[in-house]
Amino acid sequence: MRFRSLISLLFLLFFTSSAYARFVSLNPSSTSLISDGIDGGSNLAGSGSVIKSVVSAPAEEKEEACEQTYGFMPCTKTALGNVFLILVYGFLMFTAATYLSAGSELLLEILGPGIVGGLFLPMLGALPDAMLIMVSGLSGDAATAQSQVSVGMGLLAGSTVMLLTVIWGTCTVVGKCDLRDSIAVNNQDTKGFHLKDSGVTVDIWTSYAARIMAISVIPFVIVQLPQMLGSTSGRQLSVLIALILSVLMLISYCVYQVFQPWIQRRRLAFAKHKHVISGILRHLKQHALGRLLDDEGQPDEHVIRKLFLTIDANNDGHLSAAELKALIIGISFEDIDFDKDDAVGKVLQDFDKTLDEQVDQEEFVRGIKQWLIQAMGGAPSGPEAGPRTMKFLDNFHVQTKREHALLGDNENGENDEEGGEVADPKWITIKAALLLLLGAAIAAAFADPLVDTVNNFSAATGIPSFFISFIALPLATNSSEAVSAIIFASRKKIRTASLTFSELCGGVTMNNILCLSVFLAIVYVRGLTWNFSSEVLVILIVCLVMGGFASFRTTYPLWTCFIAYLLYPFSLGLVYILDYWFGWS
């Protein structure tokens, strides 16, 4: 049904064209009628003159005709007509983004993450924005491109600001859960809109994504340096340097995305191993009555040797893999799921220095001492650090549990990204390819008409095209991503919240490097003037505020949504004041 509606809309658009008319007066006294010299009031003579006046329309009215994109797309000079066309073209761009998103998800089901998830999906997500930015600077001669390129900058700034303010704040509100020990409790939302005791928690990878997003604004700073220094020379050079850097950052980001699943698995395996260490030490503490440390705060070898004897079930002086596995199975790890055999292998790797697949008493003592020193970390040592300071083991346990949770391990084997085994890979691949091609074709076909319509609406209303593209165009190109992010966040889990905010940071990062690369390439190749100081300042402020905030914390209390929401009107007001009060543009 949706596809038929799209075809019908395209059909109407293609067979619609602009039309112009003149008001014709039949009043014989009209000055537009030419007398025949016999009867000035003759209706017949007047009618003949009317025909002549209609046939020979004035030249200035012909010049007022709007220019049709591609020579056949509809256009109009009226404000309401352009509003209608903006809605139509915006819907088509939204449809293109939806098709690209659906095709990307299907492709991800077939090929999995890695190259597809790290290389193609981020680029496909930014494709509609990149198309609009590209056509805004390629239309007409250099003077026309210079006047239209503000549409591309408005879209670039508007998309970044909308994702990090309105969408970010909304995801915080719909995804909030109760906070316990500064960590959100999955699927528990009993405290309503309490500003401090409810919020969302994300994994550590979201913090990394936020840091990358903050770093991605460096090309903006470089291209803005000549204006900051008050220099008129070197502007083209700064554009070229920023272009090269943004392309290099794009390549680096894609490589990082490709290898991130492998990095994440390594980090998660290390966190699980630390959790096993914590569990074994707490278990030994209980059996040693809390005397793992002597009066000097050092590991007590005598107690550790006694513990070895209690674990050595067959009294052969060695701990085999089976005995270590029995020890691990007997310890409660609070629903942390991990491979017991893998855990035994890592314990052997820490203890077994002779590589004989078993642990003797000396190796056990040496290994436990190293674990205790690792767990003590910054705990006090010396005479005052006796058995009473064994609380450091509990602190170490809390720390390892938190690290494990923040690394985003799937609870109970759950995976929110995978829907199971694909039934018909061949058909899914064909469907994904068709959706991607259709989405790319729609975006390419209607990007130019949308830019022209925005400029026509700006001319008809006197509203700067930047503000129109800043507010309206991101709604068209990012609506699909925004809706899916909000729906995903509403599942109220740490994992889904992490994926949601990581996607928001990733989308902004692609805007800052991919879309900016396209924009800078157009400015450099066509020799356009870079004059977007206020817009760059807004992007820097929003990215650094939200990126800095998300870089150093993994829990967002509900009150933080107000910061995000307030940044949107602040950004609009700042651009207006700088451009029209201080004349920055």
Swiss-Prot record:
Induction: Induced by salt stress. Induced by cold stress, heat shock and abscisic acid (ABA). Induced by calcium and magnesium chloride, and osmotic shock. It is found in: Cell membrane; Vacuole membrane. Residues 299-334, 339-374 form the EF-hand domain. GO terms for biological process: calcium ion homeostasis; cellular response to salt stress. Ca(2+) 1 binds at D312, N314, D316, H318, E323. Glycans are attached at N478. This is Sodium/calcium exchanger NCL. It comes from Arabidopsis thaliana. The lineage of its organism: Eukaryota, Viridiplantae, Streptophyta, Embryophyta, Tracheophyta.
